[in-house]
């Protein structure tokens, strides 16, 4: 597949799928089939397709949550799943299933702080860590919710909290699975037209999954269309 841009010397693709097929346990039919895809750094890629087309499976395979049966996956230059733990520390991920139960005891800032806790036990974040949490809350526009119990928030507010958690470590790669599903129009437009383009300018790579084929964030450099577990079309810009 033709890349969006030529890589500079010593650069690596943010995402590489080389003939990848992934199966769910006990299933005879692959969830994704013979996927070939390269995503350059500092770009915004939109992956679209109907429900069940393999979009979420693609992200789960990339993060090593599912192991491919065939092919090779590289995440930020690291082999998946062998070196995925190293690569994950440089990634932010907003899953499709983000809702917290009403009885969830943690506050918004504690939930966001968990995004920094991969290398240290939760509760031992230092002053600089909490400043990073505050910055992420401000970035998404939910600093006023910092001390609220997350379980008492609306679905849209919780989705913003989980987006802030994905951003708190200033990731090199941000993976978003249906990030607008619970948001109102104003929030959608802010993220799509202001937040995501600013992340790209700062050197982040964004990969966003959506079933809404009519929606395209500002600055999108590549649209990948999936159907029945296969990539059926790739459009540049």
Feature annotation, model-predicted:
Residues 170:
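Conserved catalytic motifs of ABC-family nucleotide-binding domains
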Residues 210-211:
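H-loop/switch region of ABC-family ATPase nucleotide-binding domains
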Residues 149-153:
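Conserved ABC ATPase signature
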Residues 174-177:
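Catalytic Walker B motif of ABC-type/P-loop ATPase nucleotide-binding domains
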Residues 71-79, 86-87:
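Conserved ABC transporter NBD signature motif
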Residues 113, 127-145:
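Conserved ABC ATPase "signature" region
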Residues 63:
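Helix-to-loop junction immediately C-terminal to a conserved catalytic motif
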């Amino acid at each position: 597949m033709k890349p969006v841009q030529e890589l500079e010397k010593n650069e690596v693709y943010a995402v590489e799928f080389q003939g990848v097929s992934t199966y769910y346990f006990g299933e005879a039919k692959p969830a994704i089939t013979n996927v070939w895809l390269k995503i350059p750094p500092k770009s915004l890629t939109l992956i679209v397709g109907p429900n069940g087309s393999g979009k979420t499976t693609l992200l789960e395979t990339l993060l090593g949550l599912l192991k491919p049966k065939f092919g090779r996956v590289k995440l930020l230059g690291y082999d998946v799943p062998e070196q995925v733990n190293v690569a994950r520390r440089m990634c932010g991920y907003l899953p499709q299933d983000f809702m917290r139960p009403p009885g969830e005891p943690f506050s918004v800032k504690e939930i966001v702080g968990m995004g920094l806790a991969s290398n240290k036990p939760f509760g031992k974040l230092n002053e600089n860590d909490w400043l990073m949490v505050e910055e992420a809350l401000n970035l998404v526009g939910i600093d006023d919710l910092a001390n609220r119990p997350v379980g008492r928030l609306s679905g849209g507010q919780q989705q913003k909290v989980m987006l802030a958690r994905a951003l708190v470590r200033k990731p090199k790669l941000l993976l978003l699975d249906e990030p607008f599903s619970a948001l109102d129009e104003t929030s959608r437009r802010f993220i799509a037209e202001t937040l995501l383009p600013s992340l790209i300018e700062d050197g982040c790579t964004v990969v966003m999954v959506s079933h809404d084929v009519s929606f395209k964030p500002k600055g999108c450099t590549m649209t990948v269309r999936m159907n029945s577990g296969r990539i059926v079309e790739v459009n540049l810009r």
